[in-house]
Amino acid sequence: MKAVKIVEGRAYPLGESNIDTDIIIPAHYLKTTDRKGLAKGAFETIRAKEGNVFDNPEYKGAPILIAGDNFGCGSSREHAAWAIKEMGVEAVIAPRFSDIFSGNAFKNGLLTVVLPEADVERLLEVAKTDPITLDLENQVVTTPFQDRFHFDIDPFRKRCLLEGLDEIGLTLKDQDKISQYEDVLASDRPWV
């Protein structure tokens, strides 16, 4: 997993509330366990509308997505996080996320940042014309206009994202300690 420390650049100013996982990646794209190729289906129903933010060349390749309230609601589909990541997005900012989406996003190295609605509205305005900087280590989102929005994040999730580790990778960092423990256990309890 790629480490997430500072995410800087333009942001897709989506701003819509209640974007469910079927809008993020429609069900007919879920027939694969391959993470590649899902970006083409990401936000398909929104992209079908003329003038949508995802097809606007000003935002092409934006590493940040700014959404409205209740982003990622609906069914659990890890493909939603995969599709967003494949678009090049490293962080999503919203007033609230579905718990299951937030968990899937974290497990796939996609940072979710919860900010008050007024702060999200300000970022949506800025994102239309200017870049945004998200600093995970200091837990702050900044704009070129001296706006500073602090956010909370679970310390475990923060550590994993900063180090580019998923739960398995974090466990494997302690492989030597695990092996030592298993050796001691085997010698203390040879019958096991």
From Swiss-Prot:
<comment type="similarity">
    <text>Belongs to the LeuD family. LeuD type 1 subfamily.</text>
</comment>
<comment type="pathway">
    <text>Amino-acid biosynthesis; L-leucine biosynthesis; L-leucine from 3-methyl-2-oxobutanoate: step 2/4.</text>
</comment>
<keyword id="KW-0456">Lyase</keyword>
<dbReference type="InterPro" id="IPR033940">
    <property type="entry name" value="IPMI_Swivel"/>
</dbReference>
<protein>
    <recommendedName>
        <fullName>3-isopropylmalate dehydratase small subunit</fullName>
        <ecNumber>4.2.1.33</ecNumber>
    </recommendedName>
</protein>
<comment type="function">
    <text>Catalyzes the isomerization between 2-isopropylmalate and 3-isopropylmalate, via the formation of 2-isopropylmaleate.</text>
</comment>
<dbReference type="GO" id="GO:0009316">
    <property type="term" value="C:3-isopropylmalate dehydratase complex"/>
</dbReference>
<dbReference type="InterPro" id="IPR000573">
    <property type="entry name" value="AconitaseA/IPMdHydase_ssu_swvl"/>
</dbReference>
<dbReference type="InterPro" id="IPR015928">
    <property type="entry name" value="Aconitase/3IPM_dehydase_swvl"/>
</dbReference>
<keyword id="KW-0432">Leucine biosynthesis</keyword>
<dbReference type="Pfam" id="PF00694">
    <property type="entry name" value="Aconitase_C"/>
</dbReference>
<dbReference type="GO" id="GO:0003861">
    <property type="term" value="F:3-isopropylmalate dehydratase activity"/>
</dbReference>
<comment type="subunit">
    <text>Heterodimer of LeuC and LeuD.</text>
</comment>
<keyword id="KW-0100">Branched-chain amino acid biosynthesis</keyword>
<dbReference type="InterPro" id="IPR004431">
    <property type="entry name" value="3-IsopropMal_deHydase_ssu"/>
</dbReference>
<dbReference type="GO" id="GO:0009098">
    <property type="term" value="P:L-leucine biosynthetic process"/>
</dbReference>
<keyword id="KW-0028">Amino-acid biosynthesis</keyword>
<dbReference type="InterPro" id="IPR050075">
    <property type="entry name" value="LeuD"/>
</dbReference>
